[in-house]
């Protein structure tokens, strides 16, 4: 699949994150020409690049353990959390979302969720990955980085104004190269 086919297929996607995320990200791997995620084994030491990587973490008040699943995890590279906004039916340009009230808040909560998952990863297996990717399926990728690999503060990457890669921006080879680097050799 080439980038134009990918964008054309996904720019008007709708439905649920759960119904679309894994297919979308698998096809993105094809476009990036990187390996696709492997089957999950349930063994954290072996699940280095998988969808739905299980983690046990403390909730926001630190009082209760919870079970969660990282949408896409690649050891030494990233934790990716995905959401999906509504499809634009109002005459906006293809690939643009309706101004869904609260979508930025949804994406910020996904970032907080990713940070909880990172804190819960077993550091005896590997240090925290350098990137968090927040994906609005069919619309955007927001990048955050923390290169000390201590799980500290993940900041917008490369900066606050340029952290978001829109679906149509993937036609720019520099954006494809950036995502490919995050996927394969981010350090």
What spans do the regions from the language model cover?
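Charged, often low-complexity linker/regulatory segments
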Residues: 1-47
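Short, basic/polar, glycine-containing "phosphate-handling" surface segments that engage DNA
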Residues: 1-8, 15, 61-68, 77, ...
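N-terminal, well-ordered alpha-helical segments
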Residues: 22, 26, 53, 70, ...
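Active-site metal-binding core of divalent-cation-utilizing nuclease and nuclease-like domains
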Residues: 28, 38-76
């Amino acid at each position: 699949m080439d980038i134009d086919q990918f964008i054309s297929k996904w720019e008007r996607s709708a439905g649920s994150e759960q119904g679309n995320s894994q297919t979308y990200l698998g096809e993105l791997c094809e476009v990036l020409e990187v390996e696709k995620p492997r089957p999950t084994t349930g063994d954290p030491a072996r699940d280095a690049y998988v969808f739905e990587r299980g983690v046990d973490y403390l909730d926001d008040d630190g009082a209760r353990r919870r079970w969660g699943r990282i949408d896409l995890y690649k050891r030494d590279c990233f934790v990716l959390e995905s959401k999906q906004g509504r499809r634009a039916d109002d005459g906006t340009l293809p690939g643009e979302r309706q101004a869904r009230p609260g979508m930025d808040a949804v994406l910020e909560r996904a970032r907080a969720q990713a940070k909880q998952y990172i804190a819960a990863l077993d550091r005896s297996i590997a240090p925290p990955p350098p990137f968090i990717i927040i994906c609005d399926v069919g619309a955007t990728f927001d990048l955050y980085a923390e290169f000390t690999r201590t799980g500290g503060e993940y900041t917008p990457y490369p900066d606050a104004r340029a952290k978001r890669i829109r679906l149509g921006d993937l036609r720019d080879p520099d954006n494809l190269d950036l995502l490919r680097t995050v996927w394969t050799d981010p350090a």
